[in-house]
Each structure stands twice: as structure tokens, then as C-alpha cells.
Amino acid sequence: MSSQAPVITIDGPSGSGKGTVAGLLARELGWRLLDSGALYRLLAFNASNHGVDLTNEELLKALAAHLDVQFIAAEPGKLQQIILEGEDVSNVIRTETVGAGASMVASLPAVREALLQRQRAFREAPGLIADGRDMGTVVFPDAPLKVFLTASAEERARRRYLQLKGKGEDVSLSSLLDEIRARDERDTQRAVAPLKPAADAIQLDSTELSIEQVLQRIRSELALRDLI
């Protein structure tokens, strides 16, 4: 095992519950939290704030290397906080405009490499919970516990539907299911860091499991590895 602070990686497709599980686990253990999926949005948002063109690879690389961000695990039932340069940007980075910018910066190899190193810098004592799609395969391949959390596309669409309806949004379950299936295909077929479980990952299907049941399974794996 690495002599560095321990890392638990939680990878999986959109809607699998990995963000919720990661946040609750980080809060329970008192460990740091990394929401890797938010980093590209944060970089695009920060670049716009500093007047940096989203095609300027060198300046984006420099911004990525020094991204001042903190993820604060939320209480059960609440959203995590994302703090950028001392400001809560949890909601503003979720806009379509920021999302489009995130896609642009994610296509730049030098930026991806800089963010890879920035993600690894989150690894500090007492430990880190890293949530994403390639945490166990690319970012922290030596993590002592890797979890790959999934659920059926239908269940993930249902969860998203209930989440959006709860916010008062008018959404179609069938269209959400189509979106999730399309995203799954993009994520698993992409050339760079495709979505797949690490060879040594614990695979959990949460379709029929509650969040607490998923957490209990992870606690058992942590105990087996003397991490708690």
C-alpha cells in the first residue's frame, strides 16, 4: 500500500449515486472530498472570470495548476458546497454556458494533464474520497479501496426524474432515459479514460439498494482493509 494518505475512489456512470455516497462517506470519516466531474466546470468558470480565452491552452494550463477549490461534504439530504477562491459557486457552475465551456477545456490535452496533477494534490491526511469516472483507473491507481457504483439505466433515469420534479422542472422520464443511455455510450466508448471499473474495484449495483446499504457495504470493505 502507498505510504501516502489513503484514497477511496468511487467511480460510476451518471445517476449511480456516487456523488451522494462520496459526500456522506467523507463527512462520516472526516476525510477530504474530491468531485472530479466539477473541476472542468470550475476551470471554465474561473477562466471566464479572469478573461482567459477557452482556447488558450497555456493560460488554461496555468489556471488549472493553481485552481483554488474546496469541496465541502453536505449534511444528508443537502447538496455539497463547492468553494472557488473563497466564493460558493455550487449553483453557478451548473449552467449550460459553463457546461459548454467545460467541454471545450476538457478537449485540450495539456489542460487534462494539469487537472490530473491538481486532482492528485487533493490527497492529504487523514484521507480522500474521490468521486468521478476514472479515479480508480487513471488518477489514483494505487488507491487501497476502489468502488465502481452502478445502477440500471432505468433506475438512474427514475432518480434523476424525481430529483428534477422536486425542483419543479417539467421533464420527461423517457427523454431522461434516452439521455442517460447516450451519455453511457459516450463515456464507455471515448478514447481517453473510458468509463470502466478498475480491475481491482469492488463493483456495487445500487439498483435495489438504499444509500445506507451501499454505505454499509463500503464500511465493511474499509474494515477488511484496516482503513477504519
UniProtKB/Swiss-Prot annotation:
It comes from the Bacteria. The keyword Cell division does not apply. ATP binds at residues 12-20. GO terms for cellular component: cytosol. One of its GO terms (biological process) is nucleobase-containing small molecule interconversion. It catalyses: CMP + ATP = CDP + ADP; dCMP + ATP = dCDP + ADP. SUPFAM superfamilies: P-loop containing nucleoside triphosphate hydrolases. Its EC number is 2.7.4.25. InterPro entries: Cytidylate_kin (IPR003136), Cytidylate_kinase_dom (IPR011994), P-loop_NTPase (IPR027417). Keywords: ATP-binding, Cytoplasm, Kinase, Nucleotide-binding, Transferase. Coiled coil: none annotated. Its main location: cytoplasm. It is an enzyme of class 2 (transferase). Gene3D superfamilies: P-loop containing nucleotide triphosphate hydrolases. One of its GO terms (molecular function) is CMP kinase activity. It is found in: Cytoplasm. Belongs to the cytidylate kinase family. Type 1 subfamily. This is Cytidylate kinase.
